[in-house]
Structure formats: structure tokens, C-alpha cells
């Protein structure tokens, strides 16, 4: 497994987020070689359901400085008490949720979406780096345990160094990549009735007030309290008993 980080810098967060939502997936059994880049779709399920009511609620603090949040479709995660939950943050898939989490200064840290259906083809692999990968056993499905990962992909064809490398963290059901190249990031995980995502992007160019000083590499970011809290929040995701 390639765990060394590419030397290129990261793409801005908005482009990273679009990449996470619609641009990637696990390799098809017979990937095409005629297209210069991976293609994918991300659509909501067509199952008809009643309009979701505002049933999501925050519970009492789980530990000092932290709270728990339960979504309308009965998933729960813990988060720092001074962070903000926006639910809904946009149009959710039928029967699913669309939740954004921001810090006290309004910096977007993660998105949780459920009841999503994805499809893709891996037509071109890219150099990659894996900074962290840990299992999330609470989300196990039929013996398959997804994992939280913080990783990167490098587009060697990019002419702008700022657009060369994508940094992102989230939960994935995709196998951990090996060798020197990998398919584009697939930060989705299997969850009934289809799939879900919970993660975000690292942008060293982000200038939100309150950011820690001199943090401009993924290695440095991993040492910040922000990243540690994001990881704790994302890996705390579990179904409500």
C-alpha cells in the first residue's frame, strides 16, 4: 500500500466536494480504456416515501463538550457542542437525509447523506496516498466493515498545481488501494436500503477565521484538534438501537 503523500498541493474544497459526490466509484469488472478519466453518477432512489418530517433531534451531551445527534432515518453521531448541525442542508434523497456540519466559525467540515445510489467506471488510475485508514465496525453490513480514510489522488495531467491533488476524508466500503496507482476516491459506504456518505475535504488554502496557524499540509492537519474531532465525529456514526 502506498502511504506516502504526493508532493503536489490540494485542489480547493468546492471542487473536492463535487468530486466526492458524483465523480467516483469502485472499479467495474471490465474497466473501459477509451475514456481519459473516470466517470460516475450519483442519483437518489426512485422509491416513493412519505415526506420526511423534522424528527431529527439533538440529545444530551455524551461527554464534556460533546453532544449526540440523531437523524430522521435513525443514525446517530457525536459532535463538539460548539459545532452547528444543518438539517436539511439541501434536497435529500427520498427517505434519506442531507446534513451539513460546520464549526463555530462557519467552516464546512463534513456532510452526511443517506439513501443514495451510485454507479461508476474506473477508466483511469492515479497516484495515491493514504494517510489514515481505520475500521468502523458499527456500520458493518453482512460481514463487510467499512473504514474511515484520509487519502489523496493526484491528477498528473493537470497543468495547474493547485488543481493537481485531491485530499478528502470519509467512510468508504471500497477496498483499501494498493500498489502505486488507484481508482478515483469512492467515499460512499453500503447502508440500507442503498448507500450513504459521511465525510469532507481538506483544503490547505481555506482562510476561515480561527484556523490553526501554519497548517498547510495534510500531515500537519492530522495533528490539529479540528481533524481529530472530525475523525471522532465521523467514526462515531452508528444506527440507533
Where are the language model's segments positioned?
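N-terminal low-complexity, Pro/Thr/Ser-rich intrinsically disordered segments
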Residues: 42-75
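Extracellular/mature segments of secreted proteins
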Residues: 32-33, 129-134, 190-194
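Short, well-structured beta-strand
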Residues: 153-241
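Secretory pathway targeting signatures of secreted, lumenal, and periplasmic proteins
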Residues: 72-162, 167-169
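Bacterial N-terminal signal peptides that target proteins for export
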Residues: 2-13
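Bacterial N-terminal signal peptides
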Residues: 12-21
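Bacterial lipoprotein signal-peptidase II cleavage site
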Residues: 6-7, 20-54
Amino acid at each position: 500500500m502506498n502511504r506516502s503523500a504526493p508532493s503536489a498541493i490540494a485542489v480547493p474544497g468546492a471542487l473536492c466536494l463535487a468530486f466526492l459526490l458524483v465523480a467516483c466509484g469502485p472499479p467495474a469488472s471490465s474497466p473501459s480504456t477509451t475514456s481519459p478519466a473516470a466517470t460516475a453518477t450519483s442519483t437518489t432512489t426512485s422509491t416513493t416515501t412519505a415526506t420526511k418530517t423534522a424528527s431529527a433531534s439533538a440529545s444530551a451531551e455524551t461527554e464534556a463538550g460533546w453532544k449526540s445527534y440523531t437523524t430522521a432515518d435513525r443514525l446517530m453521531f457525536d459532535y463538539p457542542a460548539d459545532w452547528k448541525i444543518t438539517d436539511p442542508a439541501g434536497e435529500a434523497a427520498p427517505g434519506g437525509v442531507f446534513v451539513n456540519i460546520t464549526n463555530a466559525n462557519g467552516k464546512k467540515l463534513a456532510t452526511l447523506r443517506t439513501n443514495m445510489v451510485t454507479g461508476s467506471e474506473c477508466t483511469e488510475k492515479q497516484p495515491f496516498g493514504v494517510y489514515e485508514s481505520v475500521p468502523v465496525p458499527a456500520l458493518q453490513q453482512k460481514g463487510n466493515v467499512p473504514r474511515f480514510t484520509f487519502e489523496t489522488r493526484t491528477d498528473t495531467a493537470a497543468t495547474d498545481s493547485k488543481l493537481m491533488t485531491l485530499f478528502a476524508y470519509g467512510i468508504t466500503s471500497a477496498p483499501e488501494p494498493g500498489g502505486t496507482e488507484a481508482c478515483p476516491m469512492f467515499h460512499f459506504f453500503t447502508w440500507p436500503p442503498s448507500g450513504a456518505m459521511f465525510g469532507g475535504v481538506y483544503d490547505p488554502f481555506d482562510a476561515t477565521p480561527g484556523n490553526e496557524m501554519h497548517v498547510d499540509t495534510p500531515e500537519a492537519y492530522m495533528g490539529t484538534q479540528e481533524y481529530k474531532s472530525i475523525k471522532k465525529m465521523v467514526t462515531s456514526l452508528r444506527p440507533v438501537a
